[in-house]
Amino acid sequence: MPVTDSIADFITRIRNAGSAKNKTTDIPYTRVRENLSKLLLEKGYIKNYTVITSEQFPFIRVELKYMQDGQHAIKEISRVSKPGRRVYQGKDIKRYLGGLGLFILSTSKGILTDKEAREQNVGGEVLFRIY
């Protein structure tokens, strides 16, 4: 069955794997998903990711990160802009949870966090929020 919202699928797979305490999860490959994985790795929400090209289809293996007490590093992750209701933010992007969490945006300069978008003075589509 085809996926209509690949970013929501990406978020759901990570959230479900974290809830099940899985060490890794496999996500079908797209460039956007690879860029999101790279951003989550840079911000410390996942341990690592690897792009695996198999005979059938390429996928991304994401290694999840857990705290010392066994809690998932991602407390909350949810989609903001959806296919039926797009959400855009101008240059004056507000902080999520006073700067504790992040908004992830798709901008003309690529996929950026809210802080990076403010520094580069660009706005864009708010893909999801993470804490």
UniProtKB/Swiss-Prot annotation:
Q: Which UniProt key words apply to this protein?
A: Ribonucleoprotein, Ribosomal protein, RNA-binding, rRNA-binding
Q: How would you summarize the oligomeric state and partners of this protein?
A: Part of the 30S ribosomal subunit. Contacts proteins S5 and S12.
SUPFAM superfamilies registered for this protein in UniProt? Ribosomal protein S8
Q: Which NCBIfam families match?
A: PRK00136.1
| The protein's name | Small ribosomal subunit protein uS8
Q: One GO biological process from the UniProt record?
A: translation
* Protein family per UniProt: Belongs to the universal ribosomal protein uS8 family.
PROSITE patterns (UniProt xref): RIBOSOMAL_S8 (PS00053)
Write down any Gene Ontology CC term.
ribosome
From the UniProt record, list the coiled-coil ranges. none
Q: Which InterPro entries match?
A: Ribosomal_uS8, Ribosomal_uS8_CS, Ribosomal_uS8_sf
An example molecular function term from Gene Ontology annotations: structural constituent of ribosome
Summarize the protein's role: One of the primary rRNA binding proteins, it binds directly to 16S rRNA central domain where it helps coordinate assembly of the platform of the 30S subunit.
Q: What is the lineage of its organism?
A: Bacteria, Pseudomonadati, Chlorobiota, Chlorobiia, Chlorobiales
Q: Which domain of life is it from?
A: Bacteria
Gene assigned in the entry:
rpsH
